[in-house]
Design a protein with these regions (language model features):
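Conserved CoA-thioester-binding segment of acyl-CoA-metabolizing enzymes
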Residues: 1-55, 79
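Residues that form or flank phosphate/diphosphate-binding pockets in enzymes
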Residues: 27, 62, 126
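Glycine- (often His-adjacent) and acidic-residue-rich active-site loop
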Residues: 56-95, 123
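Glycine-rich beta-to-alpha active-site loop
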Residues: 99-138
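Short coil/turn segments at beta-strand junctions that form active-site/ligand-binding loops
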Residues: 48-50, 86, 113
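Short, histidine-centered active-site or binding-site loop motifs used for metal coordination
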Residues: 17-22, 74, 114, 119
Length: 138
C-alpha cells in the first residue's frame, strides 16, 4: 500500500491524497517520498491535468518525518553517513522544487500547472514544507 494516492477527475484536477495506513497521523517515510514523487510526476506529465491538489485522508495533514528515516539514510550510505544524509536531503529538496516549479518554463517562468494544498489540520515539519512548496494553501 502506498502512502500517497493519485486520482484524476473529468475536470482535469489531480488530487494527491496522503494517508499512511495504520497511523493516526501522517508521517513521511523514504517510501512515502517515492510515492509523492511518482504522483507529482504523473500529474505534471498528464496533459489532461490542469491543476493539482495535495491533501490528507486524515483529520490532520502531517506530523512530520518518520524519525527512523535518518537512521535508514545513514545505514544505506555505507562508509559515508554524511554523504548519505546529504543525498537524502537533496532528493527531498528536488521533490519539493518539482512541486514548486510545476513544469514552469525555466526561461520565461510561464506555463506550468497550479498546485494547491488543502490542510485539514496540523502540518508539522516536512508536513509543513510540502504545503509551502505549493502555490496556494487552503
Amino acid at each position: 500500500m502506498t502512502d500517497f494516492t493519485l486520482t484524476k477527475d473529468a475536470d482535469g484536477i489531480a488530487t494527491i491524497t496522503w494517508d499512511v495506513v495504520g497511523k493516526s497521523m501522517n508521517v513521511l517515510s523514504l517510501e512515502g517520498w517515492d510515492d509523492l514523487d511518482g504522483c507529482v510526476t504523473d500529474a505534471l506529465g498528464d496533459d489532461a491535468v490542469k491543476g493539482i491538489v495535495i491533501t490528507s485522508g486524515k483529520d490532520t495533514f502531517a506530523g512530520g518525518m518518520d524519525l527512523n528515516v535518518i537512521a535508514k539514510m545513514k545505514a544505506m550510505s555505507g562508509d559515508d553517513p554524511a554523504a548519505g544524509l546529504m543525498d537524502g536531503l537533496m532528493k527531498s529538496h528536488a521533490i519539493l522544487r518539482k512541486i514548486e516549479r510545476a513544469n514552469l518554463d525555466p526561461k520565461t517562468n510561464k506555463g506550468g500547472k497550479p498546485v494547491a494544498c488543502v490542510l485539514p489540520g496540523t502540518a508539522l515539519g516536512i508536513g509543513f514544507e510540502i504545503p509551502l512548496a505549493c502555490h496556494r494553501i487552503f
